[in-house]
Amino acid sequence: VEYHEFKRTLVRLIPNKYLEVGLRMIYNIEQQISKYLRGQILAASSVAILSILGLFILNQFGANITLILFIGIIAGLANLIPMVGPFFGMIPAILIALMNNIGNDAALFHKIFGTIPSPFFILDIILMFIIVQQIDNNFITPILVGESIGLHPMAVMIVLLIGGTLIGPIGMLFAIPAAGVIKVIIGEIIFISKNSHLL
């Protein structure tokens, strides 16, 4: 309700001469934000599935991690914070592995790759989430979210880097939709400059 009231107020502020351009710009921005949200949902779902799959594989080697669906969902939802999201699933996974394996000598003396000590599979869990995070950072978010708003994957990574450098995690959260909105505005400015005789 508040958004629609804001939108009506915004439309009333547009001069009649530019009403068509203004309405088209508002529509395109809405479409851009909608596509971004769909891309984020797909990316979050992908991270959740990868996290669940990774924990399931660790369980086949005796990690004894329960609630893997819950942990995967946490990792997926936290993925809304670019770059660091998957790590939020790591903490409950480690805590559950510790609680479930107390008194389990096999888990206590477990070695990752058979050589590196990893008590209670802690290093295994950390490594798994690092892998998920790298897949997300380099493939899932740049491709799914970037394509959803028409930005090249490399451009997405640069935008995230700039947002994170300037404002931190909040900057990373809003960097991509802000870039999408700027892209729409620049597109409209170019359109107006090329078709000024029609206005």
Cite the ranges covered by each PLM segment.
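Alpha-helical transmembrane segments and their immediate interhelical loop/hinge regions
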Residues: 1-96
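A short hydrophobic/aromatic micro-motif that marks alpha-helical segments and, especially, helix-coil
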Residues: 16-18, 30, 97-100, 165-167, ...
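Detector for methionine-enriched segments
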Residues: 25, 83, 90, 99, ...
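Juxtamembrane/interface motifs at transmembrane-helix termini
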Residues: 27-29, 40-45, 57, 92, ...
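Active-site activation/catalytic loop segments of kinase-like enzymes and analogous catalytic loops
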Residues: 95-108
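Hydrophobic alpha-helical transmembrane segments of membrane transport and translocation systems
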Residues: 104-105, 111-199
